[in-house]
């Protein structure tokens, strides 16, 4: 019986793309910071001159799938992390954005055989988003861990 798992010890060999929404940037900047901190602590070069990590900013979470798709056509990545924050408002816009962003990201991931980590916070309030972006816990760190594990797993399976 063969058992395959992702490895955190080979993280420094990964090529990571990050697509991030500018909308709600008070939140997304904090998530990005946590994400980059985790990647750096696991051996990736996150400096501005890095060839290991690329960051693409988009207007909002709805645009994350097309940016991820275009990014993957340009370079070869082991994993992509999609970061955003969608906070429920008084209209149905929230539901549309979350539905289309999640479907689009999943579709792009499957079409390209590259894992895309869904790091889009979906909260009812700004307070909930702030708690998940650093007041209590920074989920950016968790998204980076998922990226390391999935990137190394798919790399090993290929």
UniProtKB/Swiss-Prot annotation:
Alphabetical UniProt keywords: Riboflavin biosynthesis, Transferase
UniProt keyword Transferase present: yes
Cysteine-cysteine disulfides: none
Binding residue positions for (2S)-2-hydroxy-3-oxobutyl phosphate: 90-91, 132
Pathway involvement of the protein, from the record: Cofactor biosynthesis; riboflavin biosynthesis; riboflavin from 2-hydroxy-3-oxobutyl phosphate and 5-amino-6-(D-ribitylamino)uracil: step 1/2
Active site: residue positions: 93 (proton donor)
A single GO molecular function term of this UniProt record: 6,7-dimethyl-8-ribityllumazine synthase activity
EC number: 2.5.1.78
GO biological process: riboflavin biosynthetic process
Keyword Iron: no
Binding, 5-amino-6-(D-ribitylamino)uracil: 23, 61-63, 85-87, 118
Annotated catalysed reactions: (2S)-2-hydroxy-3-oxobutyl phosphate + 5-amino-6-(D-ribitylamino)uracil = 6,7-dimethyl-8-(1-D-ribityl)lumazine + phosphate + 2 H2O + H(+)
Pfam family, any one: DMRL_synthase
Enzyme category, top tier: transferase
InterPro entries: LS, LS/RS, LS/RS_sf
One GO cellular component term noted in the UniProt record for this chain: riboflavin synthase complex
Protein family according to the UniProt entry: Belongs to the DMRL synthase family.
Function (record text): Catalyzes the formation of 6,7-dimethyl-8-ribityllumazine by condensation of 5-amino-6-(D-ribitylamino)uracil with 3,4-dihydroxy-2-butanone 4-phosphate. This is the penultimate step in the biosynthesis of riboflavin.
Protein name as it appears in the record: 6,7-dimethyl-8-ribityllumazine synthase
The species this protein was found in: Prochlorococcus marinus (strain AS9601)
């Amino acid at each position: 019986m063969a058992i395959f798992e992702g490895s955190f010890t080979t993280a420094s060999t990964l090529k990571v793309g990050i697509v991030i929404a500018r909308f709600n940037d008070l939140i997304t900047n904090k998530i990005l910071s946590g994400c980059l901190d985790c990647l750096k602590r696991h051996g990736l070069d996150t400096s501005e001159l890095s060839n290991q990590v690329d960051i693409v900013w988009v207007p909002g979470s709805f645009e994350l799938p097309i940016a991820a798709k275009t990014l993957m056509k340009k370079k070869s990545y082991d994993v992509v992390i999609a970061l955003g924050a969608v906070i429920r408002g008084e209209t149905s816009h929230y539901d549309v954005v979350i539905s289309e962003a999640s479907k689009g990201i999943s579709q792009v991931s499957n079409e390209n055989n590259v894992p895309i980590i869904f790091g889009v916070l979906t909260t009812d309030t700004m307070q909930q988003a702030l708690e998940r972006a650093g007041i209590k816990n920074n989920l950016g760190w968790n998204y980076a861990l998922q990226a390391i594990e999935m990137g190394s797993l798919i790399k090993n399976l290929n």
